[in-house]
Amino acid sequence: MTITEPYSPNNQPITFAQITDSHLFSSVDGLHHGHNVLANLKKVLLSICDNPSIKYIIFTGDLTQDHTEQSYQNFVDCVLECHITVPIYYLAGNHDEPKLLDKYFSASPFQADKEINLSHWQVQLVDSKSATPAGYVGEQALVKLKDAIQKNKNQLLMMHHHPIDVGYFIDKHGLQNKDAFWQVINSYDNIKAIACGHVHGDMTLTNAITSPINEPVVLYTCPATSIQFDPTVDGVAALSKGPGYRLFSLYADGQLNTEVVML
C-alpha cells in the first residue's frame, strides 16, 4: 500500500508508532504477571491518539496470551473505543494465529498490507512466525523480501522476533536462522534499520557481523504494551514498569529518528 501524503518542503518527517506484545486474555480483567494488559493497551492507544503527528501504527505481534478468539475481539474493541483512525498494519507473533488476525482485523482502521511505500522510504513487515515460539524467516520470505526491496528508497524492516541476541532468556526464542537472514540484509546498502518486538524491552543494538562496505544496520527493540521483562531472571518476570511504545520519524533525506514512550 502506498501512503500518498507528501513530505513537506522543510523536510518534516512521516511519523508512526510501533506497538507490540499486548498478550490479551478473553477476560477484560485478565492479568499477566500482575498487570492488567488490556488496561495497559488502552493507555498506549490513548497516548497515540493524543499525538496528531502519528500517521499510522505498526503492531508487531503477540496479541494474545490465552489463544482465545475473544482476546482478538478485545484488541479490536479497544482500538475502536480509543477512536484510533490512522491505519494499523500488523504482524503475527509466536502466540498468534495469522488467520485469526486477518479475520478480526478485516475492517478499518486495520490494513493487511505488509509493505508501506513512502516517497523516500519503504517499510516492510517481515513474517518471522514459525511452528515454535522461536522465529524463522523462511527461504520463501527471504526471496519475497529481496524481490520487494526498492533500491532507490531507504528501507526499514519490521518483524516480531529479534535477529540479534539481547542477553537474557528470550534469546532461546529468538530468530533461529540469523545467519541466512543477515546474509540477505548485509547485501543491501539501503537497509537503514530493523525494528522488532518479542523481547519486552527497549534496546538499540547492532549486528556484530556486518558487510565491510555498508554501515552497520541498527536493531531497535520495542517495549511491550503488556509487561516489561526483567532481564536478570531466567524466565518470564515483570519489572515494575508501565506499558510503552516506540515512535519512528522518517525523513526525506534518509534520516531516521526514534524515541521510546513509557507510560
UniProtKB/Swiss-Prot annotation:
Where does the source fall among the domains of life? Bacteria
Residues engaged in binding Fe cation 2: 62, 94, 160, 198
Q: Which Pfam families does the record associate with it?
A: Metallophos
Listed EC numbers: 3.1.4.-
Give an example GO molecular function. metal ion binding
**What does this protein's record comment on cofactor binding?**
Binds 2 Fe(2+) ions per subunit.
Q: What does this protein need as cofactor?
A: Fe(2+)
Going by the record, the broad EC class of this enzyme is: hydrolase
| Residues engaged in binding AMP | 23, 62, 94-95, 200
Give the record's keywords alphabetically. Answer: Hydrolase, Iron, Metal-binding, Nucleotide-binding
Residues involved in Fe cation 1 binding: 21, 23, 62, 200
UniProt keyword Membrane, yes or no: no
- Which family, according to the similarity comment? Belongs to the cyclic nucleotide phosphodiesterase class-III family.
Designated name of the protein:
Probable cyclic nucleotide phosphodiesterase CPS_4178
Give the taxonomic lineage as stored in the record.
Bacteria, Pseudomonadati, Pseudomonadota, Gammaproteobacteria, Alteromonadales
Q: Which gene encodes it?
A: icc
